[in-house]
Design a protein with these regions (language model features):
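Acidic, glycine-rich two-metal-ion catalytic cores of nucleic acid-processing enzymes
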Residues: 122, 126-308, 392-394
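Intrinsically disordered, low-structural-confidence terminal and linker regions
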Residues: 1-13
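Short beta-strand-to-loop capping motifs
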Residues: 397-400
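Short amphipathic alpha-helical interaction segments
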Residues: 88-108, 114
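Polymerase palm active-site segment centered on the conserved acidic dipeptide of motif C
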Residues: 402-426
């Protein structure tokens, strides 16, 4: 049985799903009345919390059932976790959640199946005791599944709540050993409200609202309502990273499937991307103009593989000190007898203006500039009435909007970098 983390930011989009939630709420309250679980009526704020919690649980388990029948979601029910103030937590993750789930999973209601988490002391490889915890899991039970089927609920009946935090700030990555493997990960930071985050949030809400109202069609296996974008910043800074993630076209669809799976304004789509974005931003950083042509095409036989040069340059922008070995995944593109230093020398001989840019850890700042350009572009396209789905340094638009969108991409790039942009069409 597959399990994923619960996402209690899901919300109903359609009246049929709202009807199911209303039925569940009604039966929940009838259960409380019958078993005399309450002595008085809830306060308005507590009633609102109850309704939001039931809605979130039913929506997420509906999504789980539709995408992975028989699958489950896991959730923490510890008071320490649920009682902590946390900007990334849903209102459904409150101290009453455990009690609400217990009633929803009761034999009388049978809306969900709940398997409570537990801790067990198990031996490790050296036969030393370690404590392993199994989280509480939830899945749709018979009463909920029946309603999903009777109402013909599909992914299109689901959306996301506006209460979800869309500006995400992560700490610096730290290494840790998990199951015998070295894993590098970054924790979410519970940052204080500030004008910069507020501005980014307002911009992204405007974009998300525009996408929610857009005429987007997909094949049935994709949820065309899933257009919510989040912006992720790195290294504890709102000036590092900033890429946009989310949306069915990024998280649930292969790149090769986009052209035959999406219609925008009832039109086929094209993908427009900024060519050699990272290198152009590096040139902009030093105030220089790049040479004409493909910036990854190096006129030297030892550096003739474009894919390898692209990986090598990207790694050099992110590296915080001189490198002596080929970056991961790039060695295969070069002859076994060719050394890294010979290739990077050939690259920098062709791009002498970038000698002061490599090995300075500037890659995240270039990524931030890329994200700023994309956000500005999406807002400009919205102003022109053009629906665009972002993919890091590219946008998906309808074929009829190709020329206008390409012009907007060039204008935004020039305005923000002082350089001409190369636009590729797929």
């Amino acid at each position: 049985m597959k399990e994923r983390q619960a996402n209690f930011f899901r919300a109903p989009y359609s009246d049929p799903l709202r009807s199911i939630i209303a039925e569940v709420l009604n039966e929940f309250q009838n259960y409380e009345t019958f078993f005399k679980l309450r002595n008085r009526k809830r306060k308005a704020v507590d009633q609102a919390t109850l309704e939001a919690t039931i809605s979130a649980v039913i929506c997420d388990l509906t999504h789980c059932y539709l995408t992975e029948p028989g699958g489950a979601v896991f959730v923490s029910l510890s008071n320490q976790s649920l009682g902590r103030r946390w900007r990334y937590r849903s209102k459904a993750e409150n101290k009453k959640l455990s009690d609400i789930l217990s009633i929803l999973s009761s034999p009388e209601l049978n809306f969900i199946v709940m398997e409570k988490g537990n801790k067990a002391e198990l031996p490790d490889e050296q036969n030393q005791p370690i404590v392993k915890a199994r989280r509480t899991t939830l899945r749709a039970a018979e009463s909920l599944v029946r309603r999903i089927q009777n109402h013909n609920i599909s992914l299109a009946d689901l959306t996301f709540s506006d209460e979800e935090e869309i500006i995400i700030l992560k700490d610096k990555k730290k290494d840790s050993w998990i199951n015998g493997q070295l894993v590098s990960s970054a924790e979410l930071l519970n940052y204080n409200d500030n004008p910069i985050a507020d501005r980014y949030r307002a911009e992204l809400r405007e974009i998300n609202s525009w996408l929610r109202s857009a005429d987007i069609q997909t094949l049935p296996q994709y949820n065309h309502r899933d257009v919510r974008l989040q912006r992720f910043f790195n290294n504890s800074s709102f000036e590092i990273g900033g890429r946009l993630f989310g949306g069915f076209w990024q998280s649930g669809m292969k790149a090769a499937d986009r052209h035959h799976s999406i219609l925008i304004d009832n039109e086929p789509i094209v993908v427009l991307d900024y060519g050699q974005m990272g290198v152009r931003l590096a040139y902009s950083h030093v105030g220089a103009t790049p040479p004409n042509g493909d910036l990854y095409s190096i006129p030297n036989p030892i550096a003739a593989n474009r894919a390898g040069i692209k990986l090598l340059l990207s790694a050099a922008f992110f590296a915080e000190g001189p490198q002596t070995r080929f970056p991961q995944g790039s060695r295969k593109y070069f002859h076994p007898k060719i050394k890294y230093e010979d290739v990077i020398r050939a690259v920098l001989n062709h791009h002498p203006a970038l000698r002061g840019v490599v090995y300075k850890g500037l890659g995240h700042r270039f990524m931030f500039m890329e994200s700023q350009i994309l956000v500005a572009l999406l807002l400009e396209l919205k102003r022109q009435g053009i629906v665009a789905l972002p993919i890091h340094d590219a946008v998906i638009v309808s074929k009829k909007a190709k020329d206008a969108a390409s012009l907007a991409m060039k204008n935004i790039f020039y305005r923000m970098t002082g350089l001409e942009a190369g636009i590729n069409v797929e």
